[in-house]
Swiss-Prot record:
The Tudor domain mediates association with dimethylarginines, which are common in snRNP proteins. Residues 162-175 have a biased composition (Basic and acidic residues). Transmembrane segments: none annotated. It comes from the Eukaryota. Belongs to the SMN family. InterPro entries: SMN_Tudor, Tudor. It is found in: Nucleus speckle; Nucleus, Cajal body. A motif (Nuclear localization signal) lies at residues 142-160. SUPFAM superfamilies: Tudor/PWWP/MBT. It comes from Danio rerio (Zebrafish). This is Survival of motor neuron-related-splicing factor 30.
Amino acid sequence: MSEELMKQLSNYKAQLQQVEAALSIDPDNEDLLKLQKDLQEVIELTKDLLTSQPAEGTTSTKSSETVAPSHSWRVGDHCMATWSQDGQVYEAEIEEIDNENGTAAITFAGYGNAEVMPLHMLKKVEEGRIRDEIDGKPKSKKELQAEQREYKKKKAQKKVQRMKELEQEREDQKSKWQQFNNKAYSKNKKGQVKRSIFASPESVNGKVGVGTCGIADKPMTQYNDTSKYNVRHLMPQ
């Protein structure tokens, strides 16, 4: 999918360059200005899709500064951690610890989602439950799973909607680009219509069917009377 989007993005940029070149000659052309705006929008939408794709299915890493953890964690410990996708706190299990970078690889209990996050961001299970009680009624595992499913569903719907919008933009751009090319072709051909020699002349003196090399409306060439130079003139007297 990303390779296809890259090709389309390159094609949109090439079209935009041609439109901008045409605008440099005719800057007030409304059709060209509209086409330029539409191309810019579809380019931005395609870039957004390309940016969002690599983020899906990958683990998030947050490690800029190493901060001393408030608790001595060990592999297998259960903790409370914030899931990067929705910002909610869930119970997780520590799978691996990187003391050098001060990070831990964790897996959220009941979900199987794995992430890597700083050790100082982890909370003890008791602390997490106390915070839930302060914020409101603690959520059951079933409720948390339902929330996560709903979040994923909304995210998938949003992605499908964006893909539909992009497909519609592609079709619109395809149609507009064809119209633009047809107009340019018609403009180049303007004034090159050939007239038939049998076309009606525009003046009363013109003759139908007489080729005059593009001057059919001019009167026919006049010749002097040569009747005195007849055959008898050549015969001996």
